[in-house]
Amino acid sequence: MAAHKKTDRICCAVLILSLILTVLFMNGESLGLQASAAALGYETRLFDTTKVHTVDIVMDDWDSFIESCENEEYSACAVVIDGESYKNVAIRAKGNTSLSSVRQLGSQRYSFKIEFDHYDSGKTYHGLDKLCLNNLIQDNTMMKDYLVYRLMGQFGVASPLCS
């Protein structure tokens, strides 16, 4: 078995360097390193909790789209968010349990996934390329998700942005 004479030393050096970098990344703030504070535009616009936002979906044949929601296929639409219009955006119904719940209840209140860059690569809503609109069909208060996500955020747990 042919081995380089310094393989052990190289492996030890790589291991020590990895450990040092790990410690730096985990304790960066206590060592004086500051995290990037660059907020994306959608965080302050769409997820501003001081107001109620409007999201309007404009399609030529809404009824046909609703009838085919269970296929979970993207369809072209326009989206107007708080007065800002975005054309040639993709939308589809999302979910598994929620899709079957909507069907069982005889409702048309689907959850949707909006994809801004599905047809036009690079198109975003102030940096956001996908947006989920949840139907909250099993939440009569329509507040559980919002309250849990906000609570998780206050405790420092990674959670989706919500509004």
Q: Can you say where each PLM-predicted feature lies in the sequence?
A:
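Phosphate-handling architecture centered on phosphoinositide signaling
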Residues: A2-S163
